Amino acid sequence: EAILGTKLGMSQVFAENGDLIPVSVIEVLPNVVAAVKTVESDGYNAVQLGYGAVKEKHLTKPVKGQFEKAGIDPVKYLREYRLAEKPSYTVGQTLAADIFAEGEIIDVIGTSRGKGFAGTIKRHNHQRGPESHGSKNHRQTASLGARMSGGGGKVFKGKKMPGQLGGVRVTVQHLQVVRVDTARNLSLIHISEPTRLALIS
């Protein structure tokens, strides 16, 4: 099972024994099944979920035709989730936050928040340089390595250097559903999850 949701922020709840539990508040608006794929017709089993409202003027004609063929209202996000067995969903079916029960263990997949071009201190938690005694190497990358054998003058691939931070696919596993609020379409998940639009499975 899987469902799409949007992270609203962090909060905290008290357990019955008095423990304070930090939680991520996930808004799970109704998900609509946009397509169902099977081994017989597509070569694999999958279900395509639609999430979020969107105006038709923002859609291309091929995407608009896909919604018209399925007989569903246009949605902003479409995500496909592969299944091991033949799906039991039907096109147009609606999924809500209550597909996961309290105490259930889940995985969360999404794109982490992009933070732009960052240096090695922020990106890789490197140490700062000396702050005084004439040093000008405060936040620089510093040495990329001593002379290498075989000619030197090169930088090994994978060297920790400045670059794009965030904005990549992230999977966080074994999170626990602490509470489900079906009246407000909210799901509270133990510990922080780093994405805005999340696929909960």
Show the residue positions of the predicted features.
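Basic, glycine/proline-rich low-complexity segments that contact nucleic acids
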Residues: 1-3, 7-16, 22-179, 187
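Single conserved hydrophobic/aromatic residue that forms the stacking wall/gate
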Residues: 190-193, 197-201
